[in-house]
Swiss-Prot record:
One of its GO terms (biological process) is lysyl-tRNA aminoacylation. Binds 3 Mg(2+) ions per subunit. Mg(2+) 2 binds at E418. HAMAP family: Lys_tRNA_synth_class2. PROSITE patterns: AA_TRNA_LIGASE_II (PS50862). Mg(2+) 1 binds at E411, E418. It is found in: Cytoplasm. This is Lysine--tRNA ligase. It comes from Clostridium botulinum (strain Hall / ATCC 3502 / NCTC 13319 / Type A).
Amino acid sequence: MSKEDNVMNSFEEQANELMKERFQKLKELQSNGKDPFDVYKVERTHTSKEVKENYEDLEGKTVTVAGRLMSKRVHGKAGFSDIHDRYGKIQLYIKINDVGEEKLKEYKTFDIGDIISVTGTVFKTKTGETSIHITDFQLVCKSLRPLPEKWHGLKDPDLRYRQRYVDLIINQDVRDTFMKRTAIIKTMREYLDNKGFLEVETPILSPIAGGAAAKPFITHHNALNIDMYLRIATELYLKRLIVGGFEKVYEIGRNFRNEGMDIRHNPEFTVIELYEAYADYNDMMEITENMIAYICEKVLGTTKVQYEGTEIDFTPPWRRLTMVDAVREYAGVDFNTIKDDIEARTIAKEKHIEFKKELKDCTKGDVLIGLFEEFCEDKLMQPTFICDYPVENSPLTKKKRGNEAFTERFEGFVFGREVCNAYSELNDSIVQKERFMQQLKERELGDDEAYMMDDDFITSLEVGMPPTGGLGIGIDRLIMFLTDTHSIRDVILFPTMKPQPNNQ
């Protein structure tokens, strides 16, 4: 058994004893007609933040606050305590002359973690700390399970994620991260709304998993007796709305992919996709860099952020680099001189590039992407748009003007990681159907992430979709960069976890 396991077991043993004591206190409260769970509402007049920010107006006046008791230093006839609410903490002062002997005795029985409401007058201590001089109080929820005394001392890497509610109680920096997450998404909406985009909602359950190369989660609809998929992307439904005349749309929501989990991947994750009629991928680059800069300025106050000890500068314009140029710069291979698939496979073999399919089935485009992923991605530390992807790897994208071996697609990279993906959207229904047919062949070769045929989407393109630019941004990854967070689990409130034995 590891040292960390011993610490956890010791804590659980202590917690069990303390829980017995707390259950006994609850029984006594209930027998005395003071059951905290009979409290339905608290008439709170102020939050901790409001008391502190409005001290000059509130000094000497009576307020009622509520929160979780996080420290208690009451000895003899007086003492101090701290309660925490959403906005932070505020100090309380209690004295026997103000509440009486019985009430003070009751207050002393409160445990760390209990939730109380307090009424009292606002004042400042000799050290200048804004506090509340208690005249009355009420226990509104009894905490039966004790909080860890030293949360950072617990080494179980999963515990904070499994018990996020405790993590949020104990760690101010965790609360700050998720408050920033909310602010980032709110500001993203604000930017797009101000640009005339319309926020919409599209299906999460669909008979076809489309819009991305990924493994879907499969479920079954009993009434219709059909298998359905949790969406892997919102793209194809949003494009249908462009066809329908909604010229600027976006959706922020969860996507689901039945794939591996690591510090950058969670099976369900938050993405924004947006589409603009009469625009192309150059416009999407401008939206990306300008929107992220706007978010940085509004939420963080700067476009220069620290991430894992490196300064990342999100100031527009970002660097623009074609994939061919990136491979030439970082892998030392000039793809403009590669004549065909056979020559490309030879290069792949020399460079020891591995693929999901057999090397003999790989195209020149497959090899280009393989070289990029192997030699280039991790070099792209500052925000960079990698442009012009091979046509065979971008089935929903228009061909590059002037070079039909490539497409008008870019991905944005920061700190060696992809954060966004965008196209000049393919709107030719005939070509789109041909691309889908080629993807079906890829599936037959064993690529279970290749696109499915979506006949209704083809039908919508036959009705007619104007030239359109489309963009998708991984919100979780963006938030990781803007909060200097190492793992995606640290920016998702309740990340996917393997159940523990006995559901513990």
